[in-house]
Amino acid sequence: MTAGGRRMSMVDVTGKKEEIRIAEASGFLRLTEDGVNAVKSGESHPQGKGDPIEVAKVAAILAVKKTPELVPHCHPIKITGVDVDVEVLEDGVKMSVRVKSEGKTGVEMDALTGLVVGLVTLWDMVKYAEKDEEGQYPHTRIENVRVVEKIIKEKE
């Protein structure tokens, strides 16, 4: 496949050894007081979509598993664990996604994908409480998305 005359290919990891790979990504969803209260109440919508935090956690886990389908150069790898932590603060929600694998390539993109989808899902779950009079989101935003840790360890 070419793009602009250049050859594109997925990185060949055949010669790499299998290692334990861990990555953690974190980010923040800034919300209004009404949005934070909607998260705290466990009710995402007057018509009942479910608990915003639990739905966002499930979405994050599913997104981690779907990363190779969404990010073209990510290898399909054996994910051995996903932990999603959510902390509700007075001005929004902090989320972190930690991904573990035994493989030949890292899991940073998987952690980032899980995090972003988790935060977007959380926004979707409480958007009714975030809209202003014109139906806009002047205060709601996703911030500080980053990889906070990457670990590579030899398999025992």
UniProtKB/Swiss-Prot annotation:
GO terms for biological process: Mo-molybdopterin cofactor biosynthetic process. Keywords: Lyase, Molybdenum cofactor biosynthesis. The keyword Lyase applies. Pathway: Cofactor biosynthesis; molybdopterin biosynthesis. It catalyses: (8S)-3',8-cyclo-7,8-dihydroguanosine 5'-triphosphate = cyclic pyranopterin phosphate + diphosphate. It comes from the Archaea. Its EC number is 4.6.1.17. SUPFAM superfamilies: Molybdenum cofactor biosynthesis protein C, MoaC. The active site is at residue 124. InterPro entries: Mo_CF_biosynth-C_arc, MoaC_sf, Mopterin_CF_biosynth-C_dom. Belongs to the MoaC family. Catalyzes the conversion of (8S)-3',8-cyclo-7,8-dihydroguanosine 5'-triphosphate to cyclic pyranopterin monophosphate (cPMP). Homohexamer; trimer of dimers. This is Probable cyclic pyranopterin monophosphate synthase. The lineage of its organism: Archaea, Methanobacteriati, Methanobacteriota, Methanomada group, Methanopyri.
